[in-house]
């Protein structure tokens, strides 16, 4: 059921954005539809990153989602959101966070299952270390390697997804 709810939220988000709604308006409309469900309370995390390819500015809207990680030339930065999941309350707090990405930066977005597979209290630091020590490769290769390393901890009971996006100058 969680999978079908996630697919519904993703489909709605895509449709609203394709129809020309702003990211914020689309998320607020989805939140309202989840809050007003008559049969059951449905909650959904949303993790949205929009990168302006001309300026390199990445805007994050993190709605109850896990931390993301930005791998730079000299380290890994953790990006948090502090809002509750969509569907919890009619008043959704949207606090966009912007960060400039530069040539060679890599953005790692992970589901809560990835962090949940790591030792409690150390999740983010372990993931930062794993990302920082990943050998160079394509984003797909790096995502696969990271997932394999996290799975080696053996604590995963939830689904795990890793998405890696890179920025390079032409």
Regions found by a protein language model. Give the residues of each.
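Active-site-proximal, acidic helix/loop segment immediately C-terminal to a metal-coordinating Asp/Glu
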Residues: 1-19, 80-83, 101, 105-157
């Amino acid at each position: 059921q969680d999978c079908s709810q996630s697919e519904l939220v993703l489909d709605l988000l895509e449709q609203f954005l394709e129809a020309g709604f702003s990211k914020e308006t689309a998320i607020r409309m989805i939140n309202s539809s989840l809050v007003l469900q008559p049969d059951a309370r449905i909650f959904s995390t949303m993790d949205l990153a929009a990168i302006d390819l001309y300026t390199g500015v990445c805007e994050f809207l993190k709605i109850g989602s896990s931390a993301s990680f930005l791998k730079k030339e000299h380290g890994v930065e953790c990006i948090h959101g502090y809002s509750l999941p969509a569907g919890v309350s009619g008043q959704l707090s949207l606090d966009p966070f912007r960060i400039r990405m530069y040539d060679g930066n890599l953005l790692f977005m992970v589901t809560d299952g990835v962090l949940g597979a790591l030792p409690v209290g150390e999740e983010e630091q372990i993931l930062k270390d794993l990302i920082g020590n990943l050998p160079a490769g394509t984003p797909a290769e790096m995502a696969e390697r990271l997932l394999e390393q996290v799975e080696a901890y053996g604590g995963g009971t939830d689904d795990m997804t890793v998405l890696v996006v890179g920025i390079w100058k032409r």
